[in-house]
Amino acid sequence: MKKTLSIAALLCGLCVCANAASMVTEWTGGAGPTEGNTYELGNAGNWSNGIPSRGNGQGPDVIFNNAGTVNVNGAMVDTSDGGGITVTGNSNVTVGGTRYTGNVTVGSGSTLNLGQVDFKSSDITLDGTLNLTVCGIDPGGNGARLVFGIGGIINVNQKIWGASSFSVSGLLATTSTDLTVGEFQFVTRTLVTSAGFDGGSISLGDFTAEDGSALAKASGLMEGNAADYQGQYYLYTENGDVKVQYVVAGAVPEPATATLSLLG
């Protein structure tokens, strides 16, 4: 069985101390929509533990799990200073009003849509899609770390300001059963799309294979025979985007699980 390293495990080795959240509350949608897929953020009936709120200078942890497609209408409080927003379980969530944002986690198959966001000492952990209109850094924090899982991407409509306070790292799927064993292929994946960078360049960090094995940084874009570059990747910026080129190797398909019939 193939071993896969989670981005949560990757983050664990990088974590920094942070304040605890003021509260934890999960979206239920129990009050029902006002129209179509639009719900009121300020209706306590839509939350498991009350409307998200700050306390003692700390932001809340706001969770959307298996929420479906929802447009949450209203002004979300700032989740910075210990809080954050988590979207998982194939949810497609649009939240208005939030600005000073703590941690963000978007799981595989899920999408989070936000407007203007100022990150503050934030871990942005992406296996899914994060769409932002405006994105920057609160100068009172310690920047933001973008940690990408196998399928994560962040799309920003405008320039990323305070870009030098962002760092990029994550996981790459370096094997595929779509290729035969002994076959190698270059893959280029887009991690960040934006209109450009203000305030310096994004810090380009380290990437790891999905099984946890180390990968080496290539000195430039790789060309020619992909087999000559096994275990390497090249992370770079291009016209406001962040991309990573890496090598995928053919893998043996996992055997089908045998099932014993009670009928013999």
What would you call each of these model-derived segments?
Residues 1-7:
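Bacterial N-terminal signal peptides that target proteins for export
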Residues 2, 25, 62-63, 85, ...:
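Short hydrophobic/aromatic-rich beta-strand motifs
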Residues 6, 17-22, 244-262:
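Short, threonine-centered small-residue motifs that mark membrane-proximal processing/anchoring sites
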Residues 11-12, 263:
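Repetitive helical segments and hydrophobic/amphipathic motifs
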Residues 20-46:
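Right-handed parallel beta-helix/beta-solenoid
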Residues 23, 48-157, 164-180:
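Beta-strand repeat architectures
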Residues 31-34, 51, 68, 195-199:
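Acidic glycine-/aspartate-rich tracts in secreted/extracellular proteins
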Residues 134, 139-245:
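Extracellular, surface-exposed repeat/solenoid domains
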